[in-house]
Amino acid sequence: WGQWESSKWIVRLGRQRINWGINTVWNPNDIFNQYNYFDFDYEERPGSDALRVQYFPNFKSTLELGFAPAKQTGQSVAGMLYKTNRWQYDFQFLAGYYKEDLTAGTGWAGSIKGIGFKGEANYYFPLQEEGESNFTGSTALDYLFHFGLYAQLSYLYNGLGAAEPGLFNFASLGANQVQGPKNIFPFKHTLFTQAGYTI
């Protein structure tokens, strides 16, 4: 890969991870490098052969362009992301093209009375008649207690997910199984919780 930088620009070409996600578990905004949170053996997230251009107009805002070409043009991914900070929250807005779909989304990260509050959502508009539209959204709350206990609660909605999942759906959660961002998880409604304590 190659990279060029100046005071307000970074341009990188080659294998890289373009990380547009905010949440810990599910990242609807991450259209370039989706991953499986439950693949515990995979230590490093995958990358894309892509062009990434970042522009920093000021210390609160970032504008990004990403393009990952594919051998079949229709399977390429391209997008534009704008990040800013307002009211002590980080916000982002994106629009792009994902494998024969147009997509638009938003994300945020902040806190409510000391409780971390994050979220992401994307909508997909098919360009082919046989394609399906879809909305995916995830939100999460996390908190670190004064005695060292960390707790997190996260919810995901996937419009293309199974409302009544069977064994086949669970099989797609195994190692090396990565869902795309349009159909991010096998189920329509998913709740995830975890807790950790530092000894």
Question: What residue ranges belong to the model's regions?
Answer:
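Outer-membrane beta-barrel channels and translocator barrels
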Residues: 6-9, 18, 58-60, 86-89, ...
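Outer membrane beta-barrel
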Residues: 1-62
